[in-house]
Amino acid sequence: MPRYLTQHTLACLTRQGAEALAQRMQTGEGARAERVLVNMVEGKLFGEFRADSRESLEAWLKKEGMHYDWAVRIEWETRDGKLAPAE
């Protein structure tokens, strides 16, 4: 299943609020976050998602009311120091 990286801007969200949002992202149906990274100082959240397609990810984010700045499919990644197709 393809992976996607998303960026979200957090407006006045507490650490507890960010944690609740991350938990929602990790239990989604149709799209599910494998990793969530947060910078509270800059108000940014990054999610690494598995989804069938970009369209299904975007539909899930919209259904959940989660605004995102951008979403990109992960096509390549480094493994053992070499660039390889993303799994």
Q: PLM features: residue spans?
A:
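Short hydrophobic/aromatic beta-strand micro-patches
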Residues: 7, 48-50
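Short linear sequence motifs
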Residues: 1, 39-42, 53, 61
